[in-house]
Amino acid sequence: MSGPGLKEVVISAADWTSAILPILSKGYKLRIPLKGMSMYPLLVGGRDEAVISSIGEKKPVRGDIVLYVDEDGIHALHRIHHVKVKNYYLWGDSQTWIEGPIKEDAVLAVATEVIRKGKRISCNKAAYKFFAELWLLARPIRPGILYIARKFRSFIGRISR
């Protein structure tokens, strides 16, 4: 948000999450811009956004994207790989390692939509869930897939100049 009379302020994740969680618990959703590349290729920092909501009664499951805080106080949006009892094991879509265990109370919100290049994509649609599961299953070959995708994009960029 910018413009005449508007001041842009950077607020730490710890401050905004403690302020926003009570609002999410009342049924509101929050649209947040993304930073970083850990969720590439689905989500790209500086370009895409996520719409998050309260976890509520339905606990997040494999394939869901959740907002969590790690032991160092770092907040991130990552996908659930699996759940054991009350611990979550997460990873970013471009990562090769699984993070966890992440305690249930460290999982703060769940993504209900992603906004990719301005287009809204529901995280509850069957096609989205299918893609998410495929990407989870592709874990052993993901580095190769991402390498080929980068090379292909670079090649297309060179020939289209």
Predicted regions and their residues:
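Extended hydrophobic leader/signal-anchor segments used for secretion and membrane insertion
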Residues: 1-161
